[in-house]
């Protein structure tokens, strides 16, 4: 199977938009559509349902997703081994799309600014679902995981980096939850427990995504509301808190293998504040 087809599938599943996937992959939208059709033809199933701007994974697509991520990660690892890439100057950091968009992108920029020019340290920023990243960490394919929920595994070490605040936002002022559609943004497996008490029990999300930026851009079009980080929204501007909603504090953890050969480097990197006044 052509790995470029899987790469395209993963990007469309992340953005839920052929146009944005095309931009991220530096392809035309027709090329992205063609690749998805090729993959669907090879598998003999439809991977997405397409209704105007609403693109969703089918059941087959949901089942393929973790395998596609695993295959791509394995392929990347194989390429590195074959190319005899030096590992001592590489450092891989994994997190969800929302964490990268809302806070880790800025942190990565600060890390580069603080690096000595002669260090030659090369960062790799990985975006994937938490379950996939935990597996990569366990298999030594990932050096550091940033997540909102620490996995309960003895071989992992963790450090609480702090907390950030989520609030329920919409695109218009003075709106109530009952007037809005709900856009579910994935903030970790345990977030749904908190979410249950803050959203009506019969509330069915019109959109579920792991991208805060995608959710933010869809709020107006979908007459929706979504849980977004307060500091990030303040920087972006243009949104309003839902009138009858509360705020929610979320922890942020750094996770690594207890016997990681990058332990000293991890300690040095974590001296730079990840949340930076979140």
From Swiss-Prot:
* Portion annotated as DNA-binding: 18-37
Q: Which GO terms describe its biological process?
A: negative regulation of DNA-templated transcription
Entry keyword Transit peptide: no
Question: Thylakoid among the record's keywords?
Answer: no
Q: Which cysteines are joined by disulfide bonds?
A: none
Q: Which InterPro entries match?
A: LTTR, LysR_subst-bd, Tscrpt_reg_HTH_HdfR, Tscrpt_reg_HTH_LysR, WH-like_DNA-bd_sf, WH_DNA-bd_sf
Q: What does this protein do?
A: Negatively regulates the transcription of the flagellar master operon flhDC by binding to the upstream region of the operon.
Annotated family: Belongs to the LysR transcriptional regulatory family.
- Name of the featured protein: HTH-type transcriptional regulator HdfR
